[in-house]
From Swiss-Prot:
It is an enzyme of class 2 (transferase). Phosphorylation of dTMP to form dTDP in both de novo and salvage pathways of dTTP synthesis. Gene3D superfamilies: P-loop containing nucleotide triphosphate hydrolases (3.40.50.300). It comes from Campylobacter jejuni subsp. jejuni serotype O:23/36 (strain 81-176). GO terms for cellular component: cytosol. The keyword Kinase applies. This is Thymidylate kinase. GO terms for molecular function: ATP binding; dTMP kinase activity. The keyword Repressor does not apply. The gene is tmk.
């Protein structure tokens, strides 16, 4: 089973994934972008840009990472439990300048039509995002601010709705303000 955690920065995806690592010791844990050597380099380029990157070029860099990630991680482990911190879904939401049909077609190509079966979508409000962003050093994406994140979160919801029409997926939407223990319990039940 391929399980994906989605949500904007600061909603607790990494915390919940860490808790699952204690339970699912044989699972494959990965992340996008950055789950491969190529991905680590591309992530570094994209998060710490010193020169502006055109939106189309940025999209294609993420797609290159996704295709490599599929080949190195997802494809060879598709009969195991795979738990990923983000996926093509975030890619579609962050590439909000492009149409969903185009993004879906490009991602389908990069992933050879291998999609997650279950998605855990953690949602946060402006207060939660503000509080958590204030506690860390910000990368170039995080410096775009709360309004940017909330617009991406809105786009994530729209992408998830779009995908329900295209592929067979189960989605669990959770309020990131809940305690990490309560969220963990709900996630464990969803993965049963």
């Amino acid at each position: 089973m391929y399980v994906v955690f989605e949500g904007i920065d600061c909603v607790g995806k990494s915390t919940q994934i860490s808790l699952l690592k204690e339970i699912y010791k044989d699972a494959i844990f990965t992340l996008e972008p950055g789950g491969t050597e190529l991905g680590k380099h591309l992530r570094e380029i994209l998060l710490n840009k010193t020169h502006p990157i055109n939106k189309r070029a940025e999209l294609l860099l993420f797609l290159a990472d996704r295709a490599q990630h599929f080949e190195e991680i997802l494809k060879i482990n598709q009969n195991k439990l795979i738990i990923s911190d983000r996926s093509f879904i975030s890619g579609m939401a962050y590439a909000k300048d492009f149409e969903n049909d185009l993004l879906f077609a490009l991602n389908s190509f990069a992933l050879e039509n291998f999609f997650p079966q279950k998605i855990i979508f953690l949602k946060g409000d402006a207060n939660l995002i503000q509080e958590r962003l204030s506690q860390k050093e910000l990368d170039s994406i995080e410096k775009r601010g709360i309004e940017y994140f909330l617009s991406v979160q809105d786009k994530l919801e729209k992408v998830l709705h779009f995908l329900k029409e295209k592929i067979s997926i189960e989605i669990l939407t959770l309020d990131a303000k809940e305690s990490k223990e309560k969220l963990h319990q709900q996630i464990k039940e969803f993965l049963q």
